[in-house]
Amino acid sequence: MIANSGHIPAYKAFSQDVSLEAVCDLNASAARDTALRHDIPRWYSDVAAMLEEVHPDLVSVCTPNSTHKGLVAQALKAGANVICEKPLTLHYADTVELYALAEKLGKQLVVCQTSRFQRAYFAARDYIADGVLGNIYYAEIDRIRRRGVPSWGTFHRKAASGGGALADIGIHALDAMLWMLGSPQVSAVSGFTSDRIIHSERGVIYDLKESGAFSGVHTARRFDPAECDVEEFASGSLRTDAGISLNFKVAWAANLSDRNNMMILGDKSGLTLPELKLYGTLGENQTDFSPRLFGLGEYDDRPFAGHYYLIRHVIGVLNGTESLMITPQQVINTAATLEMFYRSSELGREVRRNEIM
């Protein structure tokens, strides 16, 4: 889905800089269908054959999480730069290993943390960096879908995805939050998961858009709730080396309204997102401040707009005109956080960073 709806349309938008040469899917008919739909000249069902025959400069990995490590390494070793869907991996050591390989081979490895590409988030990050909020001590994420369980693909199977709601939609919010905060290292995590609604509810209608398939799906897979062995709901508390406490709630399914909210508190001001608003004082008065923000550009209204801005950014990085803004250390930090979270939820206690190293 994300290849057809996000990556490929974004590449085509920058046809003056990149050309789509081939597509690969283990399902040969799906590869052929994608190639025909997007006028891509070659299609494959064998990754090694594609890499050997096409010699791509850049590869997008848009496969289930469990396959990321192997495919990213294979593409890097074939001489390609790589854009990989999030999360790169759910483990600290695997993520460190991939970035070490990319550095050794002199290639760029970029993870699709596309939620960063929003004007309000850039503004919030600048305010924080400029000290407008003062010393930050608390942050919160509230990312809830009422009924947004992906009923397509393999998101609900641990063997394929490694995790559920947190690894799917929560990782975007977590990455954006840590980035806005200046990328403090997460030192400890306490986590909780639940899957009660998926396994108890029957007959309720889900909409594809609710589950993130804004443009629909091209190769739907029959959804069987009995297969689901990942969390529909995740909550956690993080502690960072900067002294910031970060709490979050993430859900594919919850008996609440949809929401995608963030809150950051400092000793001078606080702010809320996604509609950026600051709360502080001015002189002797309490003050609310709503900056007038404009979009990032012409792709704001596209489905998966963040992929357009990410790929434009990657083109700039490869051309030497931009510095990579999704750095190895940032991605390693979120991978460590995911690993600590899932281990904590299994053990029923807080897990510290040194326990996963």
Name each region found by the language model.
Residues M1-H38:
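N-terminal Rossmann-like dinucleotide-binding module
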Residues I2-A3, S115-P225, G348:
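Predominantly a Rossmann-like dinucleotide-binding segment in NAD(P)-dependent oxidoreductases
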Residues N4, Y44, C84, L109-V111, ...:
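Hydrophobic residues in well-ordered beta-strands that form the structural core
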Residues I40-V47:
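Conserved SAM-binding strand-loop segment of SAM-dependent methyltransferases
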Residues L51-E53, D57-L58, P64-N65, K69-R116, ...:
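Beta-strand-loop-alpha-helix segment that lines the small-molecule cofactor/substrate pocket
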Residues L58-S60, K104-K107, D241, H313-M357:
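C-terminal helix-rich "cap/oligomerization" subdomain common to oxidoreductases
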Residues P150, D175-Y279, L310-T321, E339-M340, ...:
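Contiguous beta-strand/loop segments that form the cofactor/metal-binding neighborhood of enzyme cores
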